[in-house]
């Protein structure tokens, strides 16, 4: 049974497919939206998702993942990832690689990996807020793209929900930090645990205050 969509919601959703419609009118057929989750946290990976929605599909309530309640975000995640007409790929870059290349480059790597993981190759890519240097595909950077493009919003939901679930798994391995609550972000709870226990293996050594903590430890050894 098709979704019942209010006139107001239909108008909002129509505004969210303007970029996709423009790409379709230019002859592109497989248009991927791409977004990331986890650039700012002190711990855990950065996760990117690429998502290709079928032409004409409107997904009620879809929006920037950060604007959705956990319950709505989880429901939309399940809908997107179980719909055989929706194609998606996920890229995950862990803490060690983030520390090695920096978070910006790690985010690009995660996005490129997400495109590679798609079951089909897109011919056009809409990217949330970043210039993505793909060697073969035209990519359009859209500021606040997760609010302006349905494809990017879908990718943002898949990326965030995937990362949140990973952080809940990490909580079971390192329960003393509260990863299941803050997902690695620098909350008061997280910082208190970090200063009390020190960093665990998934903490980003190149991020402050962890970097400064480790520098002090090294200095104290001399």
Swiss-Prot record:
Places the protein is found: Cytoplasm
Organism: Protochlamydia amoebophila (strain UWE25)
Residue ranges annotated for the RNase H type-2 domain, each copy included: 29-219
Name of the molecule in the record: Ribonuclease HII
One GO biological process term: DNA replication, removal of RNA primer
Cofactor: Mn(2+); Mg(2+)
NCBIfam families xrefs: PRK00015.1-1, PRK00015.1-3
Entry's family note: Belongs to the RNase HII family.
UniProt GO MF annotations: manganese ion binding; RNA binding; RNA-DNA hybrid ribonuclease activity
Pfam families registered for this protein in UniProt: RNase_HII
One GO term describing the cellular component: cytoplasm
Cross-referenced InterPro entries: RNase_HII (IPR022898), RNase_HII/HIII (IPR001352), RNase_HII/HIII_dom (IPR024567), RNaseH-like_sf (IPR012337), RNaseH_sf (IPR036397)
Record note on cofactor: Manganese or magnesium. Binds 1 divalent metal ion per monomer in the absence of substrate. May bind a second metal ion after substrate binding.
């Amino acid at each position: 049974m098709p979704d019942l969509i209010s006139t107001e919601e239909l108008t909002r959703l129509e505004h969210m497919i303007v970029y996709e419609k423009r790409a379709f009118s230019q002859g592109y057929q497989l248009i991927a939206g791409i977004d990331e989750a986890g650039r700012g946290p002190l711990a855990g990976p950065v996760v990117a998702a690429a998502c290709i929605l079928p032409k004409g599909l409107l997904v009620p309530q879809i929006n920037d993942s950060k604007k959705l309640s956990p319950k709505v975000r989880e429901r939309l995640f399940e809908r997107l990832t179980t719909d055989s007409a929706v194609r998606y790929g996920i890229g995950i870059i862990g803490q060690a690689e983030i520390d090695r290349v920096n978070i910006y480059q790690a985010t690009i790597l995660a996005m490129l990996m997400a495109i590679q993981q798609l079951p089909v190759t897109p011919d056009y890519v809409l990217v949330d807020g970043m210039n993505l240097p793909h060697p073969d595909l035209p990519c359009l950077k859209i500021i606040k793209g997760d609010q302006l493009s349905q494809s990017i919003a879908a990718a943002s939901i898949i990326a965030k929900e995937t990362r949140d679930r990973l952080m809940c798994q990490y909580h079971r391995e390192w329960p003393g930090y509260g990863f299941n609550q803050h997902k690695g972000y620098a909350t008061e709870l997280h910082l208190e645990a970090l200063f009390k226990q020190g960093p665990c293996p998934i903490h980003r050594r190149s991020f402050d205050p962890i970097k400064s903590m480790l520098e002090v430890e090294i200095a104290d050894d001399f």
